[in-house]
């Protein structure tokens, strides 16, 4: 993880530059003015990863300048990370400095926290983990009030839970999420909550069904399910699928069907190219899809999946790469127009931005 340059005094100007860049990318499609959702200036990042660097006979948190993995910058605190992470950093460092068992061949530390205060720490080692390590790790987890995961080659030891529990409020309703260690979650919780509320409002109240591609742990699935008759959601990651199923059950939602298929495979299924055993018991023809929600990886949608979305009246698209978003919109522009668009500043002090668009059929 490279070291970001935090300068709150420059935040407004940097956000304006991002908004201008998004406007430039969407200008060929006659997009309306983007709604801009800012980030907290500090303590916004709910997860952080540090390498350990030996200096002066001790291990220290370290990060690196972009493009230089050999020049370590020692870290004592991390202002972009959540207050909970900043509380835990010195406590954990004191623990490994006091214990040869905890520090021996420890090379990486990961923190995962939530807006609701939950925390999980992952310790990664270049050695096998034994009973002595587990005993000290159990005491450490109790002392810090966290769950803890130890990782070494081919082995994982979980103390407490291997996930954190988050609560996000959308349109006045609180949704509970399990966010697993090692799986993708939105790093900026405050902005994530703004994204969920925007998507919920943009979709509107529908009397038909929603298809969701790339659903992850159900981050958007849960609130959007309250806006439609039924949801068919797809995800390829086994860890994310299991978390999504637990989240659906924890929130008492009974109108969501989740299948472990890639977007490309679902496209084949809907086009009746070939059957899939993982769709056994699901009658695709019983769905009346009026909308599709997509939150693809940085590469955007592949051309076939993009063509699939064309058949829907409404396309709600969250993008972590507006460059590929614009490419996908160009493919759809002859049949769909942009009704709403938004910029979500998930990653302050970087050039990265998250965008949302609602496309409706012309």
Curated annotation (Swiss-Prot):
Matching Pfam families: tRNA_U5-meth_tr
Positions of S-adenosyl-L-methionine binding: 186, 214, 219, 235, 295
Gene3D superfamilies: 2.40.50.1070, Vaccinia Virus protein VP39
Entry annotated with the keyword S-adenosyl-L-methionine: yes
GO molecular function: rRNA binding; tRNA (uracil(54)-C5)-methyltransferase activity, S-adenosyl methionine-dependent; tRNA binding
PROSITE patterns, alphabetized: SAM_MT_RNA_M5U, TRMA_1, TRMA_2
Superkingdom of the organism of origin: Bacteria
Reactions listed under catalytic activity: uridine(54) in tRNA + S-adenosyl-L-methionine = 5-methyluridine(54) in tRNA + S-adenosyl-L-homocysteine + H(+); uridine(341) in tmRNA + S-adenosyl-L-methionine = 5-methyluridine(341) in tmRNA + S-adenosyl-L-homocysteine + H(+)
Keywords: Methyltransferase, S-adenosyl-L-methionine, Transferase, tRNA processing
InterPro entries reported in the protein's UniProt record: MeTrfase_TrmA_AS (IPR030390), MeTrfase_TrmA_CS (IPR030391), SAM-dependent_MTases_sf (IPR029063), TrmA_MeTrfase (IPR011869), U5_MeTrfase_fam (IPR010280)
An example Gene Ontology biological process: tRNA methylation
The protein's Enzyme Commission number: 2.1.1.-, 2.1.1.35
GO cellular component: a single term: cytosol
Active site: 320, 354
Enzyme class of the recorded protein, top EC level: transferase
Similarity section: Belongs to the class I-like SAM-binding methyltransferase superfamily. RNA M5U methyltransferase family. TrmA subfamily.
Stated role: Dual-specificity methyltransferase that catalyzes the formation of 5-methyluridine at position 54 (m5U54) in all tRNAs, and that of position 341 (m5U341) in tmRNA (transfer-mRNA).
HAMAP family noted in UniProt: RNA_methyltr_TrmA
Protein name: tRNA/tmRNA (uracil-C(5))-methyltransferase
Organism whose genome encodes this protein: Stutzerimonas stutzeri (strain A1501) (Pseudomonas stutzeri)
Lineage: Bacteria, Pseudomonadati, Pseudomonadota, Gammaproteobacteria, Pseudomonadales
